[in-house]
Amino acid sequence: MGTGTLSSLLLLLLLVTIGDADMKGHFDPAKCRYALGMQDRTIPDSDISVSSSWSDSTAARHSRLESSDGDGAWCPAGPVFPKEEEYLQVDLRRLHLVALVGTQGRHAGGLGKEFSRSYRLRYSRDGRRWMDWKDRWGQEVISGNEDPGGVVLKDLGPPMVARLVRFYPRADRVMSVCLRVELYGCLWRDGLLSYTAPVGQTMQLSEMVYLNDSTYDGYTAGGLQYGGLGQLADGVVGLDDFRQSQELRVWPGYDYVGWSNHSFPSGYVEMEFEFDRLRSFQTMQVHCNNMHTLGARLPGGVECRFKRGPAMAWEGEPVHHALGGSLGDPRARAISVPLGGHVGRFLQCRFLFAGPWLLFSEISFISDVVNDSSDTFPPAPWWPPGPPPTNFSSLELEPRGQQPVAKAEGSPTAILIGCLVAIILLLLLIIALMLWRLHWRRLLSKAERRVLEEELTVHLSVPGDTILINNRPGPREPPPYQEPRPRGTPTHSAPCVPNGSALLLSNPAYRLLLATYARPPRGPGPPTPAWAKPTNTQACSGDYMEPEKPGAPLLPPPPQNSVPHYAEADIVTLQGVTGGNTYAVPALPPGAVGDGPPRVDFPRSRLRFKEKLGEGQFGEVHLCEVEDPQDLVTSDFPISVQKGHPLLVAVKILRPDATKNARNDFLKEVKIMSRLKDLNIIRLLGVCVQDDPLCMITDYMENGDLNQFLSAHQLENKVTQGLPGDRESDQGPTISYPMLLHVGAQIASGMRYLATLNFVHRDLATRNCLVGENFTIKIADFGMSRNLYAGDYYRVQGRAVLPIRWMAWECILMGKFTTASDVWAFGVTLWEVLMLCRSQPFGQLTDEQVIENAGEFFRDQGRQVYLSRPPACPQTLYELMLRCWSREPEQRPPFSQLHRFLADDALNTV
């Protein structure tokens, strides 16, 4: 070895030693190379799974390095060429830094000849999102074995932070491959799950210096990297000269991520860090470059804020630490920022510029886990067992091998006694079931007899709630109905008695609810007693619903401390044009309906028909154009149509043969619509009520409904990997992730406005949102009337039409509609937006299973199913959606908080 080489090695060793001293408490990837338990069986058989195996003797449990169990290795059932879909998966149970992998073929005492010459790795931190491992030059393929017996170790540069690791053997032709593996690394004690930062920039000197985070494994959108880890958490500390690197054959600036002061008018770079659990933070250490002769300076100061949950506000005053940006010593160094023991799961830190450039190579934290029982979040999605999945992102766990059990020989007497005891227990169980069934039959028969009375109010006490249902007389026969074809789902033969309907109908309150819906009003009934407040909790069967002002309470009020922050809306029957009740709204003053609608009369001659959007029981919805609208429409909002261009409007038309009650409801709907004044809610433009047919004219947006609009788009920067329907060859308009958040924020803003009026929109979904110019969103209400979305609604035994996939469990089982249930629907709508409306919510479940899942929420035994996280959705935003689906309505965030998060914090939170 030459003198120059020896000097270089000594210098490198000195630099690493200095870096370790500076970055106190930070891990050293060179020392993180312990075997993680495949060979010594610390990893149990149950944590090793495979896509398939040739036989039981080549199953997953035989894939341990240097093991000769079974036939000597794991061998997949099918060929790995050309699809490369066979994999071996290892679950480490906790996050680990994996720095090295070892592979081996099948030797089997000289009888085996199978091995893999190359392979790929995929890894996941949560079991939902899978990432391809790539080296520092973007290559995925790792060279493997050259013979069946030898062990080949491969350094992973960069290392990966993972809980689950999959090996995908490769071949260049159809051939058999077998594999044994081991993983090397150490436990990831930092607890850092991801960081968000602006994309690194390029510095132009005599040569281009690329200061990007080249190993970041999250998403990139709108100049922001989020949802992953990269070079700032890989343990590699940069050199004093940022143009040089400790890695071989890389570009100048590789070790650092940097930003120019000119690109940040605010004077600081903002980063956010997400951790695995609640922690008490003592110190943040940032390794910075200080080569001020080339423009790199230490930060002038740092300020950090903390919060405990994704949708919570930042707590208290920020922690400030002044640094000043040293000009003296040009060496790179680690700066320590004391954090004072503040507690949180999320940190937001701002690094102030003291010079032209900020260059960081590593950021680490010294913290302790805090055991706080109050910091709870909804559980991760759980899916019931089904057929073996075939996509890469599915988990397949092989059951632990069974050990032989010695059989004890018993006497015939003992066997006979055991059989008798079993028979007696079975008989007792059957008797108990029969008694329980008889009890419910009596309850239901009483409920049915009550429905037949001419005027009756029923009180049903449920733990913590009181449901008040009023039934008015009406015809016995339900309205005609033609079974819709579900959208995007195969046709199934319906069972004679659906399980989901049985679950609904087992609730006496819901039987009364459906009985009410089955009888449309046929005229004024007998006078209602003064003490009977007319209410109706029917689900989604008209356009608008309006609660009356409460009179004297029928029951004593609950204690003040038991009142949730969401109030239930008392509801009266209001059958609208499109046949579906949408809003539950506060009562109008007495006689307000009789005063007639606001006189914004619209000349029918100016309406030009374009197409029929939908129809309901009492009317239709048409899409029309209005010529020269500026001289016709007066409102509180400007009309964004150029002079000489027509205005698109939706016209709700009441059929001339509609009943008197339907006409009164139509006028009441006009009155309600006239009260809605918000930029994100469709507005009433005018009415035609001088002669038949009665019409109301509302906004309609040029880009149609949000569901159709988003499904025609693709997400920028190829973030949509894993979305249904995406293909490399698809050509179409794109939409950015920040724009999706902007869409969600507008929906939250409109719903916030409705909540301030105590309005409850009971059918919130992308089909009921309209898209205008510059992605303007307005919430509408006639999605139910469109045949295109018939598959989104479920008919309960031919009576109530319910959007059950968007409904909170208490709406499905108890008919309770509140602002909190709208928050639930908003979470589903946000899921639709982030999926670009490519999938129906719970698309893998039948309608009956969705209803049964609502029952699981009621039982609260941990078996309820949640919507899975969309591929492009950061974990923190998904946790916010899970909070929207909390079992207890009072635990769901209000719309003001949802709007603030989506409008201000979402892009900076992952």
Swiss-Prot record:
Domain F5/8 type C residues, every copy: 32-186
Domain Protein kinase: 607-902
Extracellular side: 22-414
Residues forming the catalytic site: 763 (proton acceptor)
UniProtKB keywords: ATP-binding, Calcium, Cell membrane, Disulfide bond, Glycoprotein, Kinase, Lactation, Membrane, Metal-binding, Nucleotide-binding, Phosphoprotein, Pregnancy, Receptor, Signal, Transferase, Transmembrane, Transmembrane helix, Tyrosine-protein kinase
PTM section of the record: Autophosphorylated in response to fibrillar collagen binding.
Record: residues binding ATP: 613-621, 652
Modified residues (Phosphotyrosine): 481, 510, 517, 737, 789, 793-794
Localization, UniProt: Cell membrane
Motif PPxY motif per UniProt: ranges: 478-481
Region (DS-like domain): 193-368
GO BP terms, alphabetized: animal organ regeneration; axon development; branching involved in mammary gland duct morphogenesis; cell population proliferation; cell surface receptor protein tyrosine kinase signaling pathway; collagen-activated tyrosine kinase receptor signaling pathway; ear development; embryo implantation
Function: Tyrosine kinase that functions as a cell surface receptor for fibrillar collagen and regulates cell attachment to the extracellular matrix, remodeling of the extracellular matrix, cell migration, differentiation, survival and cell proliferation. Collagen binding triggers a signaling pathway that involves SRC and leads to the activation of MAP kinases. Regulates remodeling of the extracellular matrix by up-regulation of the matrix metalloproteinases MMP2, MMP7 and MMP9, and thereby facilitates cell migration and wound healing.
Assembly description: Homodimer. Interacts (via PPxY motif) with WWC1 (via WW domains) in a collagen-regulated manner. Forms a tripartite complex with WWC1 and PRKCZ, but predominantly in the absence of collagen. Interacts (tyrosine phosphorylated) with SHC1. Interacts with SRC. Interacts with MYH9. Interacts with CDH1. Interacts with PTPN11. Interacts with NCK2.
Name of the protein described by the UniProt record: Epithelial discoidin domain-containing receptor 1
Species assigned in the record: Rattus norvegicus
Gene: Ddr1
